[in-house]
Amino acid sequence: MHIVVVGVSHRTAPVEVREKLSIPDHSITESLKALKAFSEVLEVSILSTCNRLEIYALAKDKNTGISSIKEFLSEYSGIIFEDLDPHLFCFRQEEAVLHLMKVSAGLDSLVLGEGQILSQVKKMMRLGQENQSTGPILNRLLTQSVSTGKKVRSETNLGTGAVSISSAAVELAQLKIGQEKGFDTLVSLESENVLVVGAGRMSRLLITHLKSKGCHKLILVNRNIDRALNLAQDFPDLKIVCRGLNELDENISISSLVFTSTASEVPIIDLAKIEKLNLNNKLKFIDIGVPRNISNDVKQHEFVKSFDVDDLQEVVSRNQEFRQKIAKEAESLVEEERIIFLEWWASLEAVPVINKLRSDLELIRKEELQKALSRMGPDFSARERKVVEALTKGIINKILHTPVTKLRSPQSREERQVSLKIVEKLFSLAEEDKNN
């Protein structure tokens, strides 16, 4: 069996490719079923965020397993394999384990140390378990990866003051507005007419960061107006006007800065919509939705400047040098956890031999116990029988303790193979299997 991961991220593919591979929550179950339908795939889990789509699998064969996942991704995205393959990354075995742990720790994020990815890995684990697409191997890997992410954040300073995609989006707005005014610094957003489209978690984070950067009023547009109103109630110090999506156009026309973060699978704003507004003021769009909420053609409008998640790199690079130094410490913790998982996984090779040995000894114990009890006659009480049975079980467990501990202990694969062969030969385990 082999652990593999196939996917795309902000490192390997632009947003126009990533958005076609994005798997929304309502499609996860169907996608997991499609992947499990491949005979090579034994366990599978999906991580889908604005910056990455990664499929982790336990496969019978690493090469055919990877090929199956690539086939699924090509069919799902509608991108022909020859165009998609250059954007895909593949990791096998130890590298796949290391990659997931680094992702969970925030070491592979656009924003080093960002905390949201950890909750997304937790969600991936939960969805895999709910859909019964994961088993003992991936469940163990996911659990340990989540623990690794927590450990990195608690034992290093990587997560201290870490920016997120949302905060980077706000900083990008500050930077671009400042540059228009001739500054290379982050300026206050106090004078901007701000519109936020969407009322999910990312929008909540956007509003939090907007408030900290001088914004004291904004318009919040969402398809479900009640959800927008509930979100607004969490910010009593801000003047938030809530509107339905049917009022989007008129609110764009009175805004100078628009943030979009919705779960829409198609753009909700395009050039045709903007041209109908007869804009006479400069307008900035910052779109952190994946798939994108804003069509790329809006950039053709003379009064519009539009940015997406790939443009956040300009802001992120300003803050990365300090975090790169802290990341070295975090990477050593991740490596320790990787070794622990791999040692556990390697020890599973001994399980069939251990189970066979235990089964054979248990059969002998029962046979010999029955012989002894039959000799004791009817005067031997039920309580005494229980005592003798407990005694025989204790003897078997004592006999098994040392060899089982040795077989499960950390050692190279070659050393474990030698140990397994010795045990099989001493107790004739392999010969019994052949005879059966």
From Swiss-Prot:
Pathway: Porphyrin-containing compound metabolism; protoporphyrin-IX biosynthesis; 5-aminolevulinate from L-glutamyl-tRNA(Glu): step 1/2; Porphyrin-containing compound metabolism; chlorophyll biosynthesis. Gene3D superfamilies: Glutamyl-tRNA reductase, N-terminal domain, NAD(P)-binding Rossmann-like Domain. It is an enzyme of class 1 (oxidoreductase). It holds the Pfam family GlutR_dimer. Keywords: Chlorophyll biosynthesis, NADP, Oxidoreductase, Porphyrin biosynthesis. It catalyses: (S)-4-amino-5-oxopentanoate + tRNA(Glu) + NADP(+) = L-glutamyl-tRNA(Glu) + NADPH + H(+). The active site is at C50 (nucleophile). GO terms for biological process: chlorophyll biosynthetic process; protoporphyrinogen IX biosynthetic process. NADP(+) binds at G198, A199, G200, R201, M202, S203. CDD domains: NAD_bind_Glutamyl_tRNA_reduct (cd05213). Its EC number is 1.2.1.70. GO terms for molecular function: glutamyl-tRNA reductase activity; NADP binding. The record marks H99 as: Important for activity. Catalyzes the NADPH-dependent reduction of glutamyl-tRNA(Glu) to glutamate 1-semialdehyde (GSA). Homodimer. Possesses an unusual extended V-shaped dimeric structure with each monomer consisting of three distinct domains arranged along a curved 'spinal' alpha-helix. The N-terminal catalytic domain specifically recognizes the glutamate moiety of the substrate. The second domain is the NADPH-binding domain, and the third C-terminal domain is responsible for dimerization. PANTHER family: GLUTAMYL-TRNA REDUCTASE 1, CHLOROPLASTIC. During catalysis, the active site Cys acts as a nucleophile attacking the alpha-carbonyl group of tRNA-bound glutamate with the formation of a thioester intermediate between enzyme and glutamate, and the concomitant release of tRNA(Glu). The thioester intermediate is finally reduced by direct hydride transfer from NADPH, to form the product GSA. This is Glutamyl-tRNA reductase. It comes from Prochlorococcus marinus (strain MIT 9215).
